[in-house]
């Protein structure tokens, strides 16, 4: 489960900041937090990983927004508010179950739409069209002009249903 969590962290950050490097950096931050099993401030994380504090804060705040890491607020002796970040097994479990729930909802909608309608696909550019779209375009692909082919959804629905059932077990 930890590997799936790290994958989600890396890809989410890479996608948000349009930078695979930021994704790898987020993965390092989360691995550090998980391995140390303690709350660390953003300054301490930046020092341990030898990266800028600004980048660290940016990544940590984004991960917090996605509920992929935990944060605790502390007041220092001089009455400053300091944030301490952590990752534990409960955070990982919640993150994975949350993602699984979102995927289950989307799969459910996709399975429902596939069972309720007929679909056609362009054999050249592999774009799927509903029956209404295929009729509107006269049975040809509007992009390349190739004749659209009817898609038998039974196999696809069965595959999606199996994936849905696996996700329900998480």
Swiss-Prot record:
| Residue span(s) of domain HTH TFE/IIEalpha-type | 1-93
Name the PROSITE patterns on file: HTH_TFE_IIE
UniProt-listed SUPFAM superfamilies: Winged helix' DNA-binding domain
Keywords, A to Z, come to: DNA-binding, Transcription, Transcription regulation
Record-level GO BP terms: regulation of DNA-templated transcription; transcription initiation at RNA polymerase II promoter
Which InterPro entries is this protein grouped with? TF_E_archaea, TFIIE/TFIIEa_HTH, TFIIE_asu, TFIIEa/SarR/Rpc3_HTH_dom, WH-like_DNA-bd_sf, WH_DNA-bd_sf
Note the superkingdom of the native organism.
Archaea
Q: Pfam families from the entry?
A: TFIIE_alpha
Query: Which GO terms label this protein's molecular function in UniProt?
Result: DNA binding
Task: Describe, as the record does, how this protein assembles with itself and its partners.
Answer: Monomer. Interaction with RNA polymerase subunits RpoF and RpoE is necessary for Tfe stimulatory transcription activity. Able to interact with Tbp and RNA polymerase in the absence of DNA promoter. Interacts both with the preinitiation and elongation complexes.
The record describes the protein's role as: Transcription factor that plays a role in the activation of archaeal genes transcribed by RNA polymerase. Facilitates transcription initiation by enhancing TATA-box recognition by TATA-box-binding protein (Tbp), and transcription factor B (Tfb) and RNA polymerase recruitment. Not absolutely required for transcription in vitro, but particularly important in cases where Tbp or Tfb function is not optimal. It dynamically alters the nucleic acid-binding properties of RNA polymerases by stabilizing the initiation complex and destabilizing elongation complexes.
Q: Which family does it belong to?
A: Belongs to the TFE family.
What HAMAP family does this protein map onto?
TFE_arch
Q: What free text does the record give on domains?
A: The winged helix domain is involved in binding to DNA in the preinitiation complex.
Question: What is the protein's name according to its record?
Answer: Transcription factor E
Name its species. Pyrobaculum arsenaticum (strain DSM 13514 / JCM 11321 / PZ6)
């Amino acid at each position: 489960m930890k590997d799936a969590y790290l994958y989600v962290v890396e890809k989410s950050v890479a996608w948000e900041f349009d930078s695979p490097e930021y994704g790898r950096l987020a993965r390092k931050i989360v691995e550090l937090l998980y391995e140390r099993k303690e709350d660390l401030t953003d300054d301490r994380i930046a020092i341990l990983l030898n990266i800028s504090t600004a980048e660290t804060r940016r990544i940590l705040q984004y991960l917090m927004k996605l509920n992929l890491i935990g944060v605790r607020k502390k007041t220092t002796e001089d009455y400053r508010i300091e944030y301490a970040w952590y990752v534990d097994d409960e955070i990982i479990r919640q993150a994975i179950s949350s993602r699984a729930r979102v995927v289950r909802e989307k799969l459910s909608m996709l399975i429902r739409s596939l069972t309720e309608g007929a679909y056609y696909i362009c054999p050249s550019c592999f774009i799927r069209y509903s029956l209404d779209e295929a009729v509107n375009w006269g049975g040809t692909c509007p992009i390349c002009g190739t004749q659209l082919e009817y898609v038998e959804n039974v196999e696809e629905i069965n595959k999606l249903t199996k994936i849905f059932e696996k996700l329900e077990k998480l």
